[in-house]
Swiss-Prot record:
<dbReference type="Pfam" id="PF00583">
    <property type="entry name" value="Acetyltransf_1"/>
</dbReference>
<dbReference type="GO" id="GO:0050821">
    <property type="term" value="P:protein stabilization"/>
</dbReference>
<keyword id="KW-0808">Transferase</keyword>
<dbReference type="InterPro" id="IPR000182">
    <property type="entry name" value="GNAT_dom"/>
</dbReference>
<dbReference type="GO" id="GO:0005737">
    <property type="term" value="C:cytoplasm"/>
</dbReference>
<feature type="region of interest" description="Disordered">
    <location>
        <begin position="62"/>
        <end position="85"/>
    </location>
</feature>
<keyword id="KW-0012">Acyltransferase</keyword>
<dbReference type="InterPro" id="IPR044542">
    <property type="entry name" value="NAA30-like"/>
</dbReference>
<feature type="domain" description="N-acetyltransferase">
    <location>
        <begin position="125"/>
        <end position="273"/>
    </location>
</feature>
<keyword id="KW-0963">Cytoplasm</keyword>
<comment type="similarity">
    <text>Belongs to the acetyltransferase family. MAK3 subfamily.</text>
</comment>
<dbReference type="GO" id="GO:0004596">
    <property type="term" value="F:protein-N-terminal amino-acid acetyltransferase activity"/>
</dbReference>
<keyword id="KW-0539">Nucleus</keyword>
<comment type="function">
    <text>Catalytic subunit of the N-terminal acetyltransferase C (NatC) complex. Catalyzes acetylation of the N-terminal methionine residues of peptides beginning with Met-Leu-Ala and Met-Leu-Gly. N-terminal acetylation protects proteins from ubiquitination and degradation by the N-end rule pathway.</text>
</comment>
<dbReference type="GO" id="GO:0031417">
    <property type="term" value="C:NatC complex"/>
</dbReference>
<dbReference type="GO" id="GO:0120518">
    <property type="term" value="F:protein N-terminal-methionine acetyltransferase activity"/>
</dbReference>
<feature type="region of interest" description="Disordered">
    <location>
        <begin position="1"/>
        <end position="39"/>
    </location>
</feature>
Length: 273
């Protein structure tokens, strides 16, 4: 088995490949979020996400009350207070304005695709996964520096079930970065996003590609009503730890001998609510 590279481009690993990965995930008991309040430590680029989530929840609650007839309109006078429908419309406008000002998307930028300028005039495009034709590029990029290979079924499990949470960084026709995630219910209590794989080509590191991919994935998770985002990464992977902690992730748990190469993992977590 190959040793883990000293400077891996893979910044997070799918835990199912580790010796104790799945077992530790099942045995883990959920810890209350009050033990890890962010207290403003979340990255300024992502801080608005908590406000968006809160506003979105409030909007959904008001819509549910309106649909069930619990919100009664006020009398129609010039000095009347806004009725339920008007308040709902006001919240929708506020949410739209908040989303429009989101730092993850520039003016006119779609969630799936956008372009940024890298060093040496390399134009970096960020695109959402669209077809099976992109699978080979993702596998090549992620497998290149992995100490333990994944089967194609592992990639398909994530990408086919959550294609909206897979993004690629492209320079011309070359894939230079990729992120693969999922979003589902955790213990029937809340919606948890999971970053399974993140990789950046060694020639294109230190250009913010990894950070950009993580931001796009997190924003897509927020649109799917995500409550928290978690991932595991090797405890020796200093560049990955720095990237995630700069975005507001905190160290939640140490997993001993988590990977097949015997290296410990750190579970990182970001609360969005």
């Amino acid at each position: 088995m190959a040793d883990a590279p000293s400077g891996p481009s893979v910044l997070s690993h799918y835990p199912g490949a580790g010796l104790a990965g799945e077992q530790q995930r099942e045995e883990e008991r959920h810890k209350g979020c009050h033990h890890h309040q962010l207290n403003g430590l979340i990255s300024p680029d992502l801080r608005h996400l908590k406000a968006v989530s809160s506003l979105k929840n409030k909007l959904l609650e008001q819509k549910t009350r309106k649909d069930s007839g619990l919100v009664q309109p006020q009398g129609r006078t010039d000095t009347r207070a806004p009725n339920g429908l008007e308040r709902l419309q006001g919240e929708e406008e506020k949410l739209s304005a908040c989303l429009a000002s989101c730092s993850l998307r520039g003016d006119g930028e779609a969630l799936g695709n956008h372009v940024s300028q890298g060093e040496n005039d390399d134009t970096i495009r960020y695109v959402r996964y669209e077809s099976e034709l992109q699978m080979a590029d993702i596998m090549r990029l992620i497998t290149r520096d992995l100490s333990e290979p994944y089967s194609i079924y592992t990639y398909r499990y994530f990408i086919h079930n959550w294609p909206q949470l897979c993004f690629l960084a492209m320079v011309g026709e070359e894939c230079v970065g990729a992120i693969v995630c999922k979003l589902d219910m955790h213990k029937k209590m809340f919606r948890r996003g999971y970053i399974a794989m993140l990789a950046v080509d060694s020639k294109y590191r230190r250009k913010g590609i990894g950070t950009h991919l993580v931001k796009k994935a997190i924003y897509a998770m927020v649109e799917g009503d995500c409550d928290e985002v978690v991932l595991e990464t090797e405890i020796t992977n200093k560049s990955a730890l720095k990237l995630y902690e700069n975005l507001g992730f905190v160290r939640d748990k140490r997993l001993f001998r988590y990977y097949l190469n015997g290296v410990d993992a750190l579970r990182l977590k970001l609360w969005l609510r």
